[in-house]
Amino acid sequence: MEKEPMTLAGYNKVTAELDFLKKTERPETVIALDEARQLGDLKENAEYHSAKEKLKLIDIQIAELNAVISKAVIIDPTTLPHDRVSFGSTIDLVDVDTDEEFTYTIVGGVESSAEKGMISFNSPLAKQLMGKEAGDELNATLPGGAKTFEILKVYYKEISL
């Protein structure tokens, strides 16, 4: 089984979501399913079929979150050097062709969020940034095509999800 790095914040988020599904969402859905079952004819009972489908989806989510947790390796980015890009590093870079600046933080897959500038360590850009330092130029091959970036700064910034 391949291990997946994640921050403690990411791990806590996943375990909280799992806890909510197991202790709140699933029991409430089981009750709704039982109540719908008591309404009679199950063939034409929309409430029953809806609750049954919802329970199935919740069980799938629980299984997926359990799989994430079983593969998790918690890494504390504060213990890593950030003079070069590594897990948990925040990187300021500029597209040398357009002068557009970007800031990304490298995190675990379940923590990634494009809107927040948090990219998975497995993403094409993160893989190519690893080990680089401020001042380096990077010819990145990305799904949208090739881009050239200059790394302006590599540092640690507290990760908030």
From Swiss-Prot:
Keywords, comma-separated and alphabetical: Coiled coil, DNA-binding, Transcription, Transcription regulation
Listed InterPro entries: GreA/GreB_C_sf, Tscrpt_elong_fac_GreA, Tscrpt_elong_fac_GreA/B, Tscrpt_elong_fac_GreA/B_C, Tscrpt_elong_fac_GreA/B_fam, Tscrpt_elong_fac_GreA/B_N, Tscrpt_elong_fac_GreA/B_N_sf
A biological-process GO annotation: DNA-templated transcription elongation
The keyword Coiled coil appears for this protein: yes
Pfam families on file: GreA_GreB, GreA_GreB_N
Keyword DNA-binding: yes
GO molecular function: DNA binding; RNA polymerase binding
UniProt superkingdom: Bacteria
Coiled-coil segments: 45-72
Membership in a protein family: Belongs to the GreA/GreB family.
Function noted in UniProt: Necessary for efficient RNA polymerase transcription elongation past template-encoded arresting sites. The arresting sites in DNA have the property of trapping a certain fraction of elongating RNA polymerases that pass through, resulting in locked ternary complexes. Cleavage of the nascent transcript by cleavage factors such as GreA or GreB allows the resumption of elongation from the new 3'terminus. GreA releases sequences of 2 to 3 nucleotides.
NCBIfam families linked to this entry: greA, PRK00226.1-2, PRK00226.1-4
Official protein name in the record: Transcription elongation factor GreA
Organism: Aliarcobacter butzleri (strain RM4018)
Gene field: greA
